[in-house]
Amino acid sequence: MGQKINPLGFRLGTTQSHHSFWFAQPKNYYKGIQEDQKIRDFIKNYVKNNIIISPDTEGIAYIEIQKRIDFLKIMIFIGFKKFLIENRQLGIIKEALHIDLKKNFHYVNRKLIIDIIRITKPYRNPNILAEFIADQLKNRVSFRKTMKKAIELTESEDTKGIQVQISGRIDGKEIARVEWIREGRVPLQTIQAKINYCSYMVRTTHGVLGIKIWIFIEKE
């Protein structure tokens, strides 16, 4: 039987890099990983609950964390089109995040730096595309129409190929199934091919749907 591997882990060190940068004793690795996950979840929940996002606005692409003993730097890469453009507004959000993170994670003797960086081509990032698809499915838009629209968005940003897969009780059908669509090339077995990937879960009125996206950007 064929064995599946995470496309990002498969390419670490070649076309993909880590989003966490720190060192620890082997026995303390799990603590560092747990802290990173809590920070990422906290930031995503903060954005979801405190920032009004317009329909044509993308979300968080990914979060990079750099840690030392007395230093913590968090870089939030976002794809907002019309939001977070003004420096004043950006400063207010960064300051609020700074205060809440220090309060919730008890960073007293640790310098905390937060940077919010806007990515130029948001729909090359599968996380942002998955959020778009999830939003459409929640609003009961046809899954075929949604997948075709997702492909159009990525094609407009110089991608070489995309594959979208949706699984679960699609359109409220009683029997779960898997539907997928591919456009262009998606060479999953080529290590040198730079492929961005994400797995996303969305809750709808008919149950949970799984979304998987592979985007082939370039070959290095």
Swiss-Prot record:
The keyword Ribosomal protein applies. Its main location: plastid. GO terms for molecular function: RNA binding; structural constituent of ribosome. SUPFAM superfamilies: Prokaryotic type KH domain (KH-domain type II) (SSF54814), Ribosomal protein S3 C-terminal domain (SSF54821). It is found in: Plastid. InterPro entries: KH_dom-like_a/b, KH_sf_prok-type, Ribosomal_S3_C_sf, Ribosomal_uS3_bac-typ, Ribosomal_uS3_C, Ribosomal_uS3_CS. Keywords: Plastid, Ribonucleoprotein, Ribosomal protein, RNA-binding. GO terms for biological process: translation. Gene3D superfamilies: 3.30.300.20, Ribosomal protein S3, C-terminal domain (3.30.1140.32). It comes from the Eukaryota. GO terms for cellular component: cytosolic small ribosomal subunit; plastid. Residues 39-120 form the KH type-2 domain. The keyword Metal-binding does not apply. Part of the 30S ribosomal subunit. Belongs to the universal ribosomal protein uS3 family. This is Small ribosomal subunit protein uS3c. It comes from Epifagus virginiana (Beechdrops). The gene is rps3.
